[in-house]
């Protein structure tokens, strides 16, 4: 009896909950039973990502777009309409466009450049579900150098040996299908591309990951521009850069990194679901 009482007395309890190891379920990507459910989810994430881009100052007039492949009609993709503010994007605003550039769902015009470049990327790469592009300040500044990013920070390792520089059509407004295909042909793999004198493109299996890769790539451009303004950055060795990329740079990790931003925009902008 004395032993039992002593054991009970040593229990650690807060708010009536015994402090013992618990089975905790990690965050994971949702699984859908129907195309309709998955379509709605992708559209919600697209509208939310657009609002986040607007909040972060990535809007530049009518430039910029995020696309996501339709889960059922995979040769079609959803995209933000032309000349609609990133910061006020809602699910009901989104357009469905085919690979001929026709709007097949929705009543607003589509950005011709969004069609020409993104359609070509989606066609060339079946692995790409979502693609993001904007005329963000540091991305377009860095693109003028025509260089890849260096592994100078832990975050920059997301892109180590996993992004490319595209010089074709650099600086030109791409409104021809052939020009879009020329760009896409130089982006056969990897999560990101720097289009010279234009800006950044990121792709992934989810809107979440494509959006996060864009956000962190923009900040990586900023970090390298700042570092090189005052000196010569020390590079992370190949072994460490590769290790960090493999540990943190895969699609599910990009999805996870986006979740705090998603939680915030859902709380502050519930009308995005309209």
Kindly give the residue locations of the regions a language model identified.
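Divalent metal-coordination and catalytic microenvironments
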Residues: 68, 121, 135, 183, ...
């Amino acid at each position: 009896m004395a032993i039992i009482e002593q054991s009970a007395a040593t229990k650690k309890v807060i708010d009536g909950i015994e402090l013992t190891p618990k089975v905790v379920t990690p965050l994971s990507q949702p699984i859908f039973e129907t195309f309709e459910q998955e379509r709605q989810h992708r559209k919600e994430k697209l509208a939310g990502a657009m609002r986040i881009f607007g909040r972060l100052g990535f809007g530049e007039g009518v430039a910029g777009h995020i696309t996501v492949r339709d889960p059922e009609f995979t040769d079609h993709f959803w995209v933000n309409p032309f000349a609609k503010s990133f910061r006020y994007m809602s699910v009901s605003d989104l357009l469905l466009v085919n690979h001929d550039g026709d709007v097949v769902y929705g009543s607003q015009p589509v950005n011709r450049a969004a069609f020409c470049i993104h359609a070509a990327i989606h066609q060339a790469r079946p692995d790409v579900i979502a693609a993001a592009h904007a005329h963000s300040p540091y991305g377009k500044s860095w693109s003028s150098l025509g260089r890849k990013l260096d592994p100078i920070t832990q975050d920059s390792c997301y892109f180590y040996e996993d992004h490319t520089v595209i010089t074709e059509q650099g600086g030109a407004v791409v409104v021809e299908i052939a020009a879009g295909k020329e760009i896409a042909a130089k982006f056969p793999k990897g999560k990101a591309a720097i289009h010279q004198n234009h800006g950044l493109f990121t792709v992934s299996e989810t809107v979440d990951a494509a959006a996060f890769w864009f956000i962190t790539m923009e900040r990586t451009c900023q970090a390298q521009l700042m570092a090189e303004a005052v000196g010569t950055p020390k590079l992370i060795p190949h072994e460490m850069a590769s290790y960090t990329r493999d540990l943190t740079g895969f699609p599910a990790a990009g999805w996870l990194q986006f979740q705090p931003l998603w939680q915030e925009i859902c709380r502050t902008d519930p009308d995005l679901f309209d």
